[in-house]
Amino acid sequence: MKIHHLNCGTDCPLGGALFDGRSVGPLGRIVCHCLLIETDADGLVLVDTGYGLADVHHPHRPPSPRITLPWRLMLNIRLRETETALRQVEALGFKAADVRHIVVTHLDFDHAGGLEDFSDATVHVMAREYDDATGPRASVVARNRWRPRQPDGVQQWQRYGARGEPWFGFDAVRDLTGLPPDILLVPLPGHTWGHAGVAVQTGEGWLLHAGDAYFYREEMRGARRRCTPGLRAYQRLMEVDARSRLLNQARLRELSIGRAGQVTIACAHDPVELERCQAGQPL
């Protein structure tokens, strides 16, 4: 099993280091860290998709924009075709049809934008996330985070309940239809009720893509949590339940310390984590 670490979308919010902890100018840099997994017998598997081709070319087309203007301005999203998962899959010598499965941490617009670029793929998601994203969206945040046109092209969904077998103290859904047991969904509610991490057995240990369960590298791997002001505020804006989010974040932090040799944890938006993963360096 081979894993490629991709950046499938870049945001450059005003605030610089107040967001990413390292920029020297007025703009920060936040990535959309996705995984492309080459399995032995089940084709290619994507974990999240970032922004898709239609997001790049028609982000605000009425009557239902794929990305709402307030969120695009707030995040200062840089939509680039070369960063879409499809174009990166093609650059690696594969075709869209080679991607047979997509496992999503959740269906926010910056994670699900590329779903329809892989129309032959089965999309695996927590049932609660699917229901919340496709049902009535009452709050302002819900209406902006879940964009109906992004998942419209999905032909095959596989939805899962929250119960499963233990995985390092977390419940985990192990039997993902059509996928090897080396790929698991790990429910991590808080950012959304149906949010989950995706755990992958690499042969050298487990890699847990934690999605938006945390946003900043120093929220893990240290006794005390540290997060930049910008990302701390954004997490609070987007959370559906602060207690669940912070509890799961604390559990992940304990896992990152106590099982450092067995489990590597990376989130969806930290550029330093992405760069280290791409370089094969420890986090």
Residues covered by each model-derived region:
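Conserved beta-strand hairpin/beta-sheet module of binuclear metal-dependent hydrolase folds
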Residues: 2, 10-87, 198-211
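Cap/insert and terminal regions of metallo-dependent hydrolase folds
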Residues: 53, 66-67, 71-85, 204-283
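Metallo-beta-lactamase
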Residues: 77-98, 127-187, 237-262
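Core dinuclear metal-dependent hydrolase active-site scaffold
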Residues: 2-5, 19-22, 34-39, 161-203
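Active-site metal-binding motif and surrounding structural segment of the metallo-beta-lactamase
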Residues: 60-125
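Short hydrophobic/aromatic-enriched beta-strand-loop microsegments
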Residues: 122-127, 209-211
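Active-site metal-binding loops of divalent metal-dependent hydrolases
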Residues: 49-51, 107, 129, 190-192, ...
